Amino acid sequence: MNIDLLRELEGEVLNFYQKKKMMGVSFLTGVLGVLIDLKPAALLINDKLNESKLLDNKRIMEILNKLGVDLVRERLNKFSNEEIEYLYLAKTARVCLELQKWHREFFNSVSESGEILDKKVWSEANYQIGKILGYPETATLEYIRMQIEGIEKDNNYRSRMERNYYYMHSARYENEEFEAYDLRLNLAVNEYLPVTAEIMQANTKKDG
């Protein structure tokens, strides 16, 4: 792991987001998760702020290339009038394209308003996306079940959302999922991205 390059990436990304640094945290933790082999791939967004996009900064692309990750882009605007450029990031182009394929399947399985049109296709797409993003299977399966069955989001659900930053944990296996994914990524953030770690800790204290 090239720590100097990672620290430079951290600086470039957080500088772009300025006061919206938690958006930069999402990008950086996604990249780091791929680099430490926790996630086969990351699904990110080429955000636009003040009329410029994150990857307009060519140095960010140079650093990502030097770190050994590949990137596939796709512009979609299904759920809003504003076009979003999605980034599929992995160590190989094959995995990037696999994530892109299932993300397209997901988009094709829902209406413009987000209503599920084909439950079977939607469920399989979400399962495969969760797998490629490295999320614990128990968490992905519970998310799918809640959406398909229309289970009401109670206080327990909201508490888990507040406690867990990266994805929606299941009620039964929350601790196991945290140890398998969150803890490993948190430790890597503390080691390689110190400014990002400080931002995450400050945000947690603010929410608390």
List each language-model region with its residue ranges:
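A conserved ligand/cofactor-binding region detector
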Residues: 1-117, 128, 135-208
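An amphipathic, hydrophobic-aromatic interaction surface with interspersed Lys/Arg
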Residues: 123-130
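Internal, hydrophobic cores of structured domains that mediate oligomerization or house catalytic pockets
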Residues: 118-122
